[in-house]
Amino acid sequence: MNANTPTPIDGQPTELTPSTQAALEPANHAPASPGATHIRSFVHRRGHITQRQRDALEQLMGKWAIPYAPRPLNPATAFGREAPTILEIGFGMGETTEKIALARPEDNFLGVEVFNAGVGSMLHRIETSQIPNVRIIQHDAVEVVRDMIAPDSLAGVHVYFPDPWPKKRHHKRRLLQPAFVQLLASRIKPGGYLHCATDWQDYAVQMLEVLGGEALLENTAQDYAERPAYRPQTKFETRGLRLGHGVWDLIFKRKA
C-alpha cells in the first residue's frame, strides 16, 4: 500500500445529529446540574441540504468519516500513514479545507463539523477531488478535542471564521474562550501552531486577549499576523475586503 493511500474507515456512518454533553467534563462524568452553562462549539440550526450533500452523507460517511468515541484517536490508523496532523474546527462547506489539503499533501487534516450540509459538501469534495489526506468527525468539537485528541499530538489547529455571536449578551457562546483555548493548547505539540481568523473586529480583539493569556502559547507576531500563503482567501472574504471589511489572522505557537 502506498503511504499516501488511505485505509478505509470501518464501521457505519455516524449519527447525523451529534450529542452534546458538558464541554470540559470527563467523558464518563455525570451530567451537570440543570441550568449549568457549557461551552459548545455549535448550536442547533435547521438548514437546507441538497440532494448531492444528502447522497454523500449516505454513501461516503463510512469511507471518509470517523465516528466519535470517548477514547484517543490513532491518526496513523485513521489516515493509513504517519504524518503531521492538523485539526480543522468548523470547516463549513469545505472550500478552504479542500484547497489547503490539496496544497499540503504531506500533512493529514482532521476536520470537525456538525452541520449536515457542510459535512455532505466536504465528503463530496474529498471523493470527487480524490483528497486522501482528509478525515471528518461529525460531532461537537469541544468533545472531540477533549476525548479523542491526545496531549502534545497535533502539528497545528485551524479555527477559521467561527460564529462571532455579535450581540454582547451572546459573547459567552463564542468558541474561543480561555477554557477551550487551554484545552487546545494542551493538544498541540511543542512547536506546533494555533491559527485563527475572523472578520469581526471585536472578536479579533477577544481572540488576541484570550490567546495571549494562555501560558502554553506565544504570539508569532506583535499582535495580528499577515494571512499566510497556505490559507486561501474565500469568495466571501474577497467580497468583504472589497467592501472595506477587515479580516484578522492570529497565529500562536505552542511553547517548547
UniProtKB/Swiss-Prot annotation:
Where is substrate annotated to bind? K167, D199, T234, K235, F236, E237
Pfam families per UniProt: Methyltransf_4
Alphabetical keyword list: Methyltransferase, S-adenosyl-L-methionine, Transferase, tRNA processing
Q: Catalyses which reaction?
A: guanosine(46) in tRNA + S-adenosyl-L-methionine = N(7)-methylguanosine(46) in tRNA + S-adenosyl-L-homocysteine
Q: Which catalytic residues are annotated?
A: D163
Q: What class of enzyme is it?
A: transferase
**What Gene Ontology terms describe what this protein does at the molecular function level?**
tRNA (guanine(46)-N7)-methyltransferase activity
Q: Which SUPFAM superfamilies match?
A: S-adenosyl-L-methionine-dependent methyltransferases
Q: Which cellular component, as a GO term, is one annotated location?
A: tRNA methyltransferase complex
Please state the pathway this protein functions in, per its UniProt record: tRNA modification; N(7)-methylguanine-tRNA biosynthesis
Cited InterPro entries: SAM-dependent_MTases_sf (IPR029063), tRNA_(Gua-N-7)_MeTrfase_Trmb (IPR003358), tRNA_methyltr_TrmB_bact (IPR055361)
Known function: Catalyzes the formation of N(7)-methylguanine at position 46 (m7G46) in tRNA.
Similarity comment: Belongs to the class I-like SAM-binding methyltransferase superfamily. TrmB family.
Kindly provide the name given to this protein in its UniProt entry. Answer: tRNA (guanine-N(7)-)-methyltransferase
Q: What is the lineage of its organism?
A: Bacteria, Pseudomonadati, Pseudomonadota, Betaproteobacteria, Burkholderiales
